Amino acid sequence: MKIKGIDVSEWQEGIHWKNAKKDGVQFGMLRAGYGSAILYPEQYDKTFEQNYKWAKEAGVNVGAYWYSYASTAEQAKTEAESFIKALKGKQFEYPVAMDVEETCITTEAVKAFCSELEGHGYYVMIYANLDYLNNRLDMSQLTQYDVWCADWSDSCGYSRAGIWQYTADGSVNGIKGRVDMNYSFLDYASVIKDAGLNGYKATSDDTVPCVEAKKILEKLAHAKQDIADIEAMVK
């Protein structure tokens, strides 16, 4: 399964989401802001509300992400509170992600950020490139969270990736200039809605709980990688 998507911020202002959908875009990861925006409101992304509204109207599934600068658990919690404020009252079919790019970010900060979001009923994901995932973060402490891997190559080099950002130089109808392109390997929309996360209500009383849903998705991710490895061997 490969579901085509994009991730956007105020750098791609004025997106025509209906045209993007016609061009095959099925989901969009929207930047909500960065840093401690609850203390510094100018750090909220000025296009987040507009992108959310227009993507929804176009029938494009949405997730969200927050660009982090947190080096401590305390800073991470403040950032998470800022993110939650932006997410409140909305529904997201795709995960909400911590964007880990700055060298100051620690594993402890990532744990604190993700735990805060998860405690508020969100399906949480970690965005990072291969170097961070393999060398900078202790991913053994973060196995309960899905991974959105930035790896600008012909195939995703991280076996646990639920979403793969495969280029920052994409082109999509409805967007001026270049845009980050992604593939989702999992049907997040179904799992999130069924589990009653990200602003949705559970579809039934016996819905798979959040933690169990994540375990299922992790197994699917491993199965996806196993299939890819087998296909590579027979080519």
Ranges and model annotations:
Residues 1-114, 118-123:
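Substrate-binding cleft of extracellular glycoside hydrolase catalytic domains
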Residues 1-12, 18-19, 140-211:
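Functionally critical loop-and-helix segments that line ligand-binding/catalytic clefts
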Residues 36-37, 71, 133, 156, ...:
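Flexible, glycine-rich phosphate/dinucleotide-binding loops
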Residues 86, 194, 233:
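Residues that form generic nucleotide/phosphate-binding pockets
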Residues 92-162:
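Catalytic domains of cell-wall/extracellular-matrix polysaccharide-remodeling enzymes
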Residues 204-235:
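Short, low-complexity, charged amphipathic interaction modules
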